[in-house]
Curated annotation (Swiss-Prot):
<feature type="domain" description="AB hydrolase-1">
    <location>
        <begin position="49"/>
        <end position="328"/>
    </location>
</feature>
<dbReference type="GO" id="GO:0009086">
    <property type="term" value="P:methionine biosynthetic process"/>
</dbReference>
<dbReference type="GO" id="GO:0009092">
    <property type="term" value="P:homoserine metabolic process"/>
</dbReference>
<keyword id="KW-0012">Acyltransferase</keyword>
<dbReference type="InterPro" id="IPR008220">
    <property type="entry name" value="HAT_MetX-like"/>
</dbReference>
<keyword id="KW-0486">Methionine biosynthesis</keyword>
<dbReference type="GO" id="GO:0008899">
    <property type="term" value="F:homoserine O-succinyltransferase activity"/>
</dbReference>
<keyword id="KW-0963">Cytoplasm</keyword>
<feature type="active site">
    <location>
        <position position="350"/>
    </location>
</feature>
<comment type="similarity">
    <text>Belongs to the AB hydrolase superfamily. MetX family.</text>
</comment>
<dbReference type="Pfam" id="PF00561">
    <property type="entry name" value="Abhydrolase_1"/>
</dbReference>
<feature type="binding site">
    <location>
        <position position="351"/>
    </location>
    <ligand>
        <name>substrate</name>
    </ligand>
</feature>
<dbReference type="GO" id="GO:0005737">
    <property type="term" value="C:cytoplasm"/>
</dbReference>
<dbReference type="InterPro" id="IPR000073">
    <property type="entry name" value="AB_hydrolase_1"/>
</dbReference>
<keyword id="KW-0808">Transferase</keyword>
<feature type="active site">
    <location>
        <position position="317"/>
    </location>
</feature>
<dbReference type="GO" id="GO:0004414">
    <property type="term" value="F:homoserine O-acetyltransferase activity"/>
</dbReference>
Length: 369
C-alpha cells in the first residue's frame, strides 16, 4: 500500500580524517570530511537491496518523509516511500548531501582543520568524481558492497553516470533523469550570470562574508531568479501567470508588477538562508567542467560494466533538453552499455523530474524491479 514514511532523521558521519584523507581528482585533499545522510527502509540480510539517491544542485539529504517540527516533506517524497516507485518496503534507500554542499556535508563554509577558520574560497575545486568518492565511503560505512541502483535527477543523474565510470561493478542499475553528459554553452552561460551576480555583490567580501557577518543575498537572489526560469517551461509560465498584472489601468511602475515577476521574487527570496552562495559557486562550476566522455579512461571503464542504464527526458525541459539524453544514449550504446531512453510528455519543464508526469513513476518502478 502506498503511504508515507512518517518522521525521519538526518544523520552525520565523519568519513575522512588526517590518517585517511579524501584525495581529490584535482590533486588536493580534505583531511576532514563529514557527510549528512538519511536512510529509509531496511537493509536485507544479503545487503543487496540498497538504492542510493543523488540529489540535484540545491538539494539535500532530506529526500522523503518528515522532520519533527516541520510540515515540509522531503523533496522526492512522491517517489520514495512504502509502495512508491522507490519502495521502502523492498529497498534500503540512502540519500546524502553532496560534498561541497551546505546542508550538513563538508563544503566551503566548513572549518578548515589547518586554520580553524571557514575554508571559503580556499576550499578546493571539486570534480564529479570527488562527490562520488565521498558517497562511496558512506556506502562502505553502511556495510554495502554493491548497490541495487543509484537514482538521480539533473546534477544527481550526472553523479550516477560518474559513479558507474569510477566503479563499473558497483551498481546493478543506473537511473538518470533530466540529466546530461556535458553542459551546453547556453547552460554554462546561465551559470556564469548567476556566479557573476553573487561575486559582484558588495557583501561577497571576496568570499569571506561569513567572517564579516554579512551575506551576498542580493546577488544570490538574482542568481536564483535567473536559474529558476530555466527550471520551468514557457507553457507552465503561460498557464500559471499569463500576462496578469497586480496594478490597475495606467498605474505603471518600475518595480515588480506582473505576476510572473512576483513569482520570481518569491523564488529568489525563499532561496536565501536555505542555500549558501559559495556552495552555489563551487557546484555550478563543477557542472560546467563535467564532460566524462572527453576522458580517455571513460570508454575503458564503461566497456567493462554490466550496469543497466535508464535515461528519461521531458519534452518541455529546455535546461537539459532531450538532445542531451539522445547524445548520452548514443555514447553509452557505442561502448556496448545496456541503455533504455525515453522522452516523456510533460508541461513542467526541467522540474518535471520532481513531479509526476504521466508514465514517469511507472517507468522507474518497472526498471528497479
Amino acid at each position: 500500500m502506498t503511504g508515507s514514511l512518517g518522521y525521519v532523521e538526518t544523520q552525520r558521519v565523519v568519513l575522512a580524517g588526517p590518517d585517511d584523507p579524501l584525495h581529490l581528482r584535482g590533486g588536493g585533499r580534505l583531511d576532514h570530511v563529514e557527510v549528512a545522510y538519511e536512510t529509509y527502509g531496511s537493509l536485507s540480510p544479503a545487503r543487496d537491496n540498497a538504492v542510493f539517491i543523488c540529489h540535484a544542485l540545491t538539494g539535500d539529504a532530506h529526500a522523503a518523509g518528515l522532520h519533527v517540527g516541520s510540515k515540509k516533506r522531503g523533496w522526492w517524497d512522491n517517489l520514495i516511500g512504502p509502495g512508491k516507485p522507490v519502495d521502502t518496503d523492498r529497498f534500503f534507500v540512502i540519500s546524502a548531501n553532496l560534498l561541497g554542499g551546505c546542508s550538513g556535508s563538508t563544503g566551503p563554509l566548513s572549518t578548515d582543520p589547518a586554520t580553524g577558520a571557514p575554508y571559503c574560497l580556499d576550499f578546493p575545486m571539486l570534480h564529479m568524481s570527488d562527490l562520488v568518492a565521498a558517497h562511496r565511503r558512506l556506502v562502505a560505512h553502511l556495510g554495502i558492497e554493491r548497490l541495487h541502483a543509484a537514482v538521480g535527477g539533473s546534477l544527481g543523474g550526472m553523479q550516477v553516470l560518474q559513479w558507474v565510470i569510477d566503479e563499473p561493478d558497483a551498481l546493478e542499475r543506473a537511473v538518470l533523469v533530466a540529466a546530461s553528459s556535458r553542459l551546453s554553452p547556453e547552460n554554462i552561460a546561465f551559470s556564469a550570470i548567476g556566479r557573476e551576480a553573487i561575486m559582484s555583490d558588495p557583501d561577497f567580501c571576496n568570499g569571506r562574508y561569513v567572517e564579516q557577518g554579512v551575506f551576498p543575498w542580493r546577488g544570490q537572489k538574482v542568481a536564483r531568479m535567473m536559474a529558476h526560469i530555466t527550471y520551468v517551461s514557457a507553457q507552465s509560465l503561460e498557464t500559471k501567470f499569463g500576462h496578469r498584472r497586480r496594478s490597475r489601468g495606467d498605474a505603471w511602475t518600475l518595480g515588480p508588477d506582473y505576476e510572473v515577476e512576483h513569482y520570481l521574487q518569491h523564488q529568489g527570496q525563499v532561496f536565501l538562508g536555505r542555500f549558501d552562495a559559495l556552495s552555489y559557486l563551487y557546484l555550478t562550476r563543477l557542472l560546467d567542467y563535467f564532460d566524462p566522455f572527453a576522458d580517455p579512461g571513460t570508454a575503458a571503464a564503461l566497456r567493462s560494466t554490466a550496469t543497466r542504464f535508464q535515461l528519461t527526458s521531458f519534452d518541455s525541459d529546455w535546461r537539459f533538453d532531450s538532445t542531451q539524453s539522445a547524445r548520452m544514449t548514443a555514447e553509452l550504446k557505442a561502448l556496448g552499455v545496456a541503455v533504455d531512453w525515453a522522452e516523456l510528455a510533460s508541461p513542467f519543464g526541467h522540474d518535471s523530474f520532481l513531479l509526476q508526469p504521466p508514465g514517469y513513476h511507472e517507468r522507474i518502478a518497472e526498471f528497479l524491479g
